[in-house]
């Protein structure tokens, strides 16, 4: 590539650098993009670059594939209801071991390898996330019944003071989705939904959900059915038609929740696309699916 072409590419990003300068962007990082080494490098480099051009990324990570593998090694079968992991006490210990003990530190190390400053946190740090036990309902024979998810929580309150301090000091916060209830009990939080809550509390400009799919599609086996832009009413219609199911449901709940709390747009991108985060922020067309209120 000629030097002038490289310069033109950099200049193309200038309006977006100006627009998002000093803004917070919440990155929810999950899926198989977290276990692909090349994809992990792309994401880390993207986040460090964002920080150095004056944009403030905040990371909330999942770890579903690694948690599943750890459970299976210990003779436990992962169980999900509407995309939420059923969590008994032993499963919660495994979740914390994988999220806080392994994945969080791996992300921090990767960011620092590429020149960033990063601090690993969980929702337990500095009373960051207060949570309560989640009540889940299912429809059975036209009846609404309550199902017990175990030690699964939903966010009641996000105290942003610790994150604000870290962002001001030029650190990239990396947050594991474990919350604490008012009795001091740990609760497993769905990372997508927690990311939406934190994005809203932080007044983030964008929520970017880095996963292992290209975005929201009518048919997951047909890339041509990818939606580039969706509104909340359109998404609700897709759920009613059964086009959005399983693990995508919590992601959509997170999208709607974040938009309701003032986030301007939510983007679902494939972390296996090289530099998907930079492409989403700094190019006209972006990648993946953008979700807005209307």
From Swiss-Prot:
SUPFAM superfamilies: Carbamate kinase-like
Main location: cytoplasm
Residues the entry annotates as binding substrate: 63-64, 85, 188
EC number, UniProt record: 2.7.2.8
Site entry: Transition state stabilizer: 28, 251
One GO cellular component term noted in the UniProt record for this chain: cytoplasm
Subcellular location: Cytoplasm
Gene Ontology BP, a term: arginine biosynthetic process via ornithine
Any one GO molecular function term: acetylglutamate kinase activity
Source species, domain of life: Archaea
Function: Catalyzes the ATP-dependent phosphorylation of N-acetyl-L-glutamate.
Family matches, as HAMAP family: ArgB (MF_00082)
Name used for this protein in its record: Acetylglutamate kinase
Organism: Methanococcus maripaludis (strain DSM 14266 / JCM 13030 / NBRC 101832 / S2 / LL)
Underlying gene: argB
């Amino acid at each position: 590539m000629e030097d002038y072409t490289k310069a033109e590419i950099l200049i193309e990003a200038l309006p977006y650098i100006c627009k998002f300068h000093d803004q917070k962007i919440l990155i929810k990082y999950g899926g198989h993009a977290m276990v692909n080494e090349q994809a992990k490098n792309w994401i880390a480099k993207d986040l460090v670059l964002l920080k150095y051009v004056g944009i403030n990324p905040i990371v909330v990570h999942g770890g579903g594939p690694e948690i599943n593998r750890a459970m299976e090694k210990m003779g436990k079968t992962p169980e999900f209801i509407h995309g939420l992991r059923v969590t008994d006490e032993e499963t919660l210990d495994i979740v914390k071991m994988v999220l806080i003990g392994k994945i969080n530190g791996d992300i921090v190390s990767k960011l620092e390898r590429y020149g960033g400053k990063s601090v690993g946190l969980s929702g337990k740090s500095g009373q960051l996330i207060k949570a309560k036990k989640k009540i889940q309902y299912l429809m059975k024979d036209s009846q609404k019944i309550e199902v017990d998810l175990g030690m699964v929580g939903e966010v009641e309150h996000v105290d942003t003071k610790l994150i604000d301090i870290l962002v001001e000091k030029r650190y990239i916060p990396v947050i594991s989705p474990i919350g604490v209830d008012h009795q001091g009990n740990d609760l497993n939080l769905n990372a997508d939904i927690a990311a939406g809550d934190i994005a809203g509390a932080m007044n983030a400009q964008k929520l970017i959900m880095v996963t292992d799919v290209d975005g929201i599609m009518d048919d997951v086996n047909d890339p041509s059915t990818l939606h580039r832009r969706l509104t909340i009413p359109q998404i609700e219609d897709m759920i009613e038609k059964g086009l959005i199911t399983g693990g995508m449901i919590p992601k959509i709940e997170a999208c709607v929740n974040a938009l309701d709390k003032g986030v301007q747009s939510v983007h679902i991108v494939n972390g296996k696309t090289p530099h998907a985060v930079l492409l989403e922020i700094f190019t006209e067309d972006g990648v993946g699916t953008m979700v807005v209120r209307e």
